[in-house]
């Protein structure tokens, strides 16, 4: 889950340390920690808790580099594996020689493989890590023991034993494709096809509840209706159903959302269109509940009405969780020609988060949105295609799983949600290398047909312009329709524009300078295009290259044309350079003060423009703006108070005397304690962005000797990491209770945590139970907003590509991410330090109330941190405490948990955030994850050219931060006027235990595990 990413390395290191122990040495707390991590992994989501706990006892952790072969085809297996991170290629050879092996698919996160160890059959394929990967490994003896003990749980979870399929053996043959219910590739899907043949119990119950609620509260909605001289019995109208649902619950925010919720019932046949159409519409169309299909449909009893009142909100919550997926399926089931612009945008947004498509350009993804087809199959065992057939389609799994089967070898692997297969068929004409068989009922796929995909690629290539020098590409442009309406006004021909796909840094800069439009009416459009370059240039063209290039472009003189033409060109060229410099300086702001090259360039550039302005009146508009920026940055840099000192405590709590927190800059100095092996310490004073090498030098000066010193960061659980000499800004990357140690390398193993790192021994419930939940949420939001506002957009870029590559600090981002962990552990700490059961119940209520108020204030970061704290295993296992929580609060918590649902790449959260207007504090770990996803899924350089499409995607994500902050956070007047100093101080100085093992032990002491 994303939160594990947010907690940086501590929580992950914790569970890995537990797995590294020998099974006999693992305590119940170790198992709890491993269990918490594994239950969020896709491969284990359907495993029974008892089985998963046994896996926690016997599993091992493996971290493998790219290119490692786990086993070869024909080997006798000794281990079963599950993929926790990364991906692996499955290679098969007809001759059993690895030289001619063909990659038939890729195993992604959540995939499990290796069941052949149950009967010692040879491995059917070679498995090679595609990238750095994390695996869970279970040895053969342990896996067989699990199989014997939990066969009833595992039988439906592991790949079915198809056995060896020898050629000519009738018994071993895969079911014939003609005998399986399969939608033919080129037969258009009709929306009338139902997705499930039998409605699920949950959906049946939901339909009954909604029907009873309507009959109880608005009985006029269900009645006989006449239309075109025909009578339709006991029907509702689509628009009325949407109106009614919006009125019933606060969890429905739009008509589109309500449509999706009714679509859930329609897909399962619990609600039906009178003409059997299968997509629900917010129109004057007639729909009938399943119960009303009967002539003698009963009216609800008083007992049923009472049950309905109790269950209605839970039903609404269930449908609101299922609605987005149903709405997406509804769109995908429309024939491509019937999809609206809004439909295409929804599909495109979904495609952005599918790893299998991450390497494709924006244009290709948008084109795919128009041709993707939804395909579903009700029965496990259905053959999607057979080995040896012509490949005509590429599939992406939306729901369910499939087995990859090869004749003579059986099941070689299983693919799950998010994995793809059949892609080779789109790029060559080779026959299918394997058969694909559904391993469970009700599987959903996205399908791309070869003809459509090849057409898209042909169109893209036809619209691609390649500029060459010395027979080498130096700039690749793509022709796309102009996005703004102004470009098309008064012109019968649709306007075209060119976007940069890739190029050398110099040619990319040259292109942007040449295409800057100087007309005032086009300022906004020009700024938007330039923004990608000025935000991302640090990745491929640092200021040491950019500044000289800008000077050269500014002074460039054309060699051809009349004197007037040359003068006009030179003038406009200079104005374009000034325009880019203004936006560049505005983006970087006071970060430029830390860059000597940039400061020298700005001063030199200002002098050049000032000289030219005396002779050219056209510069009169731009000069004052440039002068203002240069003076502001120069004066700030020279101000004596500029270098404010940052104390150790400030990293956690901020300066209580200051009215507002100020951003930390790399040149700011920090007073920091570095500890020795005997827990004595020396205080050093270095810049925040100092490298580890500089930290060692400062420590050596204090200690009198630096011979063989290393710098180690250690968390409260004793996890130690030796820092590399080129690591920078290490002070803010520590965990909440982490500390820095300095010692000779030979003393590394003897380092132990400080007693103070253990955290508090008594809770603060006595203090904050007297504070209003709304006051606490308000002050938390005020502080979080200050932290969030201090984060510069470029820190996101430095964090994504590695700050050591830029020698820049990400201190403000680090502290904001640490705040998430601090609030999360604050919740767990307070609950685990509360020994009285009734007080713990009150604590749960308090935290749920605070979370609700944070959500009202649009502080999604703290909202998620609190909810994740409540879902921490040390809290969630306290069954006696949760049993006594009133049902109203349980419902609130269930609704909050539903927003944390990580499925479909956190779609529940994304939909919620998309409905909110700024100001907004986002769930920052997910934004970081999105940028990392784009970075890792796309190369920075392609054929020695900068992949600018990747730069554009990352810049687009980073820009959401600017959007969230585009409106100021206006404090609640009623809250701001209160005497809030105590609450303000409390939320800024949280004291927590961040050792999961300690928290689990405390939890077990509060409520020992039931026998």
UniProtKB/Swiss-Prot annotation:
Instruction: Classify the source by domain of life.
Output: Eukaryota
Q: Which CDD domains does this UniProt record tie to the protein?
A: CAP_ED (cd00038), DEP_Epac (cd04437), RasGEF (cd00155), REM (cd06224)
Positions binding 3',5'-cyclic AMP in this chain are 422-425, 432-433
Q: In which tissues is it expressed?
A: Expressed in cerebellum, pituitary, adrenal gland and liver.
- Domain DEP positions: 216-291
| Disulfide bridge positions per record | none
Quaternary structure?
Answer: Interacts with RAP1B, RIMS1 and RIMS2. Probably part of a complex with RIMS2 and GTP-activated RAB3A.
Q: What domain comment accompanies this record? A: The N-terminal nucleotide phosphate binding region cAMP 1 has a much lower affinity for cAMP as compared to cAMP 2.
| Name of the protein in question | Rap guanine nucleotide exchange factor 4
Q: What organism does the record attribute this protein to?
A: Mus musculus
Source species taxonomy? Eukaryota, Metazoa, Chordata, Craniata, Vertebrata
């Amino acid at each position: 889950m994303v939160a594990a990413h947010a907690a940086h390395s501590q929580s992950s290191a914790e569970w890995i340390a537990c797995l590294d122990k020998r099974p006999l040495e693992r305590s119940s707390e170790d198992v709890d920690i491993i269990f918490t991590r594994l239950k969020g992994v896709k491969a284990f989501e359907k495993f029974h808790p008892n089985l998963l706990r046994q896996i926690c006892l016997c599993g091992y952790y493996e971290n493998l580099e790219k290119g490692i072969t786990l086993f070869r085809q024909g080997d006798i297996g000794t281990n079963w594996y599950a993929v926790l991170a990364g991906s692996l290629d499955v290679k098969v050879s007809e001759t059993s020689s690895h030289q001619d092996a063909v990659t038939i698919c890729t195993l992604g996160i959540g995939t499990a493989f290796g069941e052949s160890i149950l009967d010692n059959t040879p491995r059917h394929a070679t498995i090679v890590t595609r990238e750095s990967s994390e695996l869970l490994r279970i040895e053969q003896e342990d896996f067989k023991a699990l199989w014997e003990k939990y066969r009833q749980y595992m039988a439906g979870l592991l790949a079915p034993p198809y056995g060896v399929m020898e050629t000519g053996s009738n018994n071993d043959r895969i079911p014939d494709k003609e005998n399986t219910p399969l939608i033919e590739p080129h037969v258009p899907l009709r929306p009338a096809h139902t997705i499930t043949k039998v409605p699920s119990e949950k959906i049946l119950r939901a339909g009954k509840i909604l029907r009873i609620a309507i009959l109880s509260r608005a009985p006029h909605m269900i009645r006989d209706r006449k239309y075109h001289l025909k009578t339709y019995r006991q029907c509702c109208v689509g628009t009325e159903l949407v109106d009614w649902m919006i009125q019933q619950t606060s969890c429905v925010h739009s008509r589109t959302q309500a449509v999706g919720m009714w679509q859930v019932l329609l897909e399962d046949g619990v609600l039906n269109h009178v003409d059997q159409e299968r997509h629900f519409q917010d129109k004057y169309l007639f729909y009938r509940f399943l119960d009303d299909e009967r002539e003698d449909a009963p009216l609800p009893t008083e007992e049923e009405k009472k049950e309905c009142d109790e269950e209605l909100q839970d039903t609404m919550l269930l449908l609101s969780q299922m609605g987005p997926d149903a709405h997406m399926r509804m769109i995908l089931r429309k024939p491509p020609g019937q999809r609206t612009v809004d439909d295409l945008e929804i599909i495109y947004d979904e495609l952005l988060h599918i790893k299998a498509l991450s390497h494709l350009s924006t244009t290709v993804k948008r084109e795919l949105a128009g041709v993707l087809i939804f395909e579903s199959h009700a029965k496990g065992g259905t053959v999607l295609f057979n080995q040896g057939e012509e490949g005509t389609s590429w599939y992406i799994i939306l729901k369910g799983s499939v087995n990859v089967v090869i004749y003579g070898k059986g099941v070689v692997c299983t693919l799950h949600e998010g994995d793809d297969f059949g892609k080779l068929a789109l790029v060559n004409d080779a026959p299918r290398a394997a058969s694909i068989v559904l391993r469970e009922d009700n599987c959903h796929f996205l399908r791309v047909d070869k003809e459509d995909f090849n057409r898209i690629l042909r169109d893209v290539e036809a619209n691609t312009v390649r500029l060459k020098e010395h027979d080498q590409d130096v700039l690749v442009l793509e022709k796309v329709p102009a996005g703004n309406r102004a470009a098309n006004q008064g012109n019968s021909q649709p306007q075209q524009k060119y976007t940069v796909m890739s190029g050398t840094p110099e040619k990319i800069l040259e292109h942007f300078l040449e295409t800057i439009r100087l007309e005032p009416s086009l300022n906004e459009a020009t700024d938007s295009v330039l923004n990608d370059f000025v935000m991302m240039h640090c990745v491929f063209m640092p200021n040491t290259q950019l500044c000289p290039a800008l000077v050269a472009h500014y002074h460039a003189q054309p060699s051809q044309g009349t004197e007037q033409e040359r003068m006009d060109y030179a003038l406009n060229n200079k104005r374009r350079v000034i325009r880019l410099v203004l936006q560049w300086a505005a983006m970087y702001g006071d970060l430029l003060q830390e860059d000597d090259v940039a400061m020298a360039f700005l001063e030199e550039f200002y002098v050049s423009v000032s000289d030219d302005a005396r002779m050219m009146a056209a510069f009169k508009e731009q000069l004052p703006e440039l002068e203002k920026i240069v003076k502001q940055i120069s004066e700030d840099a020279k101000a004596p108070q500029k270098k404010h000192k940052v104390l150790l405590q400030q990293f956690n709590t901020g300066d209580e005397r200051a009215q507002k927190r100020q951003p930390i800059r790399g040149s700011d100095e920090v007073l920091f304690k570095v500890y020795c092996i005997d827990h004595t310490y020396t205080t050093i004073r270095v810049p925040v962005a100092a490298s580890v090498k500089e930290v060692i030098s400062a420590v050596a000066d204090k200690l009198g000797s630096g011979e063989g010193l290393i710098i180690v960061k250690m968390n409260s659980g004793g996890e130690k990491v030796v820092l590399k000499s080129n690591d920078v800004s290490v002070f803010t990357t520590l965990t909440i209770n982490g500390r820095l140690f300095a010692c000779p390398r030979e003393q590394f193993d003897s380092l132990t945590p400080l007693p103070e790192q253990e955290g508090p021994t008594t809770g603060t419930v006595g203090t904050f139970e007297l504070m209003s939940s709304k006051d606490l949420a308000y002050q938390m939001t005020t502080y979080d907003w200050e932290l969030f506002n201090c984060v510069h957009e470029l820190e996101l870029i430095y964090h994504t590509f590695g700050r050591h590559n830029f020698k820049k600090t990400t201190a403000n981002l680090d502290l904001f991410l640490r705040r998430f962990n601090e609030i999360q552990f604050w919740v767990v700490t307070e609950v685990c330090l509360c020994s009285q059961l009734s007080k713990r119940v009150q604590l749960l209520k308090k935290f749920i109330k605070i979370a609700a108020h944070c959500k009202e204030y649009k502080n999604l970061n703290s909202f998620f941190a609190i909810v994740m704290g409540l879902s921490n295993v040390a809290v969630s296992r306290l069954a006696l405490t949760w049993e006594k929580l009133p049902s109203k609060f349980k419902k609130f918590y269930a609704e909050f948990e539903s927003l944390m649902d990580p499925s479909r790449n956190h779609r529940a959260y994304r939909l919620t955030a998309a409905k909110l207007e700024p100001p907004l504090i986002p769930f920052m770990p997910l934004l970081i994850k999105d940028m990392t996803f784009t970075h890792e899924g796309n190369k920075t350089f392609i054929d020695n050219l900068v992949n600018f499409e990747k730069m554009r995607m990352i810049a687009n994500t980073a820009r959401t931060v600017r959007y969230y902050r585009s409106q100021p956070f206006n404090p609640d007047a009623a809250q701001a006027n209160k005497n809030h100093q105590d609450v303000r101080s409390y939320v800024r100085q949280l004291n927590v235990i961040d050792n999961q093992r300690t928290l689990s032990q405390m939890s077990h002491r509060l409520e020992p595990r039931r026998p």
